[in-house]
C-alpha cells in the first residue's frame, strides 16, 4: 500500500510539473520529504530532472502536445519527430 501511495504522489507531482505550476527544485524537495534520500528517491529525482528539461513534451517517441511539430514547422518548415525525449526537425525515426 505504501508503494502505491508513493507512486501516486510521484505521478501527481509529475503532472503538476508538466503544467508548469511548480519548478523542478520544489518537486525534488517534495520527493526528499516523501521518499527520502535513498535509491528510490534518487531514481524519482532523475526522472523528474529528465522530464523537467524536456522542452517540447516528447515522451517515449510520442509528441504529447504536438509542440515539437509546431516548433519545427515554425523554425525550419519541416516535420518534427520525437526521439525519446528530444525533438528533431526533419529526422524521422529509423527503427
UniProtKB/Swiss-Prot annotation:
Cystine connections? 58-82, 68-87, 72-89
Keywords assigned by UniProt?
Answer: Antibiotic, Antimicrobial, Disulfide bond, Fungicide, Secreted, Signal, Toxin
Q: What SUPFAM superfamilies does this protein map onto?
A: Scorpion toxin-like (SSF57095)
One GO cellular component assignment for this chain's record is: extracellular region
User: Which tissues and organs express this gene's product?
Assistant: Expressed by the venom gland.
Signal sequence span is 1-19
Give the protein family. Belongs to the long chain scorpion toxin family. Class 3 subfamily.
Please give the name of this protein.
Opiscorpine-3
Amino acid at each position: 500500500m505504501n508503494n502505491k501511495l508513493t507512486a501516486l504522489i510521484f505521478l501527481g507531482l509529475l503532472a503538476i510539473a508538466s503544467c508548469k505550476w511548480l519548478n523542478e527544485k520544489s518537486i525534488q524537495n517534495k520527493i526528499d520529504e516523501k521518499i527520502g534520500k535513498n535509491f528510490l528517491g534518487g531514481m524519482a529525482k532523475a526522472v523528474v530532472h529528465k522530464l523537467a528539461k524536456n522542452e517540447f513534451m516528447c515522451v517515449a517517441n510520442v509528441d504529447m502536445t504536438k509542440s515539437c511539430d509546431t516548433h519545427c514547422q515554425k523554425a525550419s518548415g519541416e516535420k518534427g519527430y520525437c526521439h525519446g525525449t528530444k525533438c528533431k526537425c526533419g529526422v524521422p525515426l529509423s527503427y
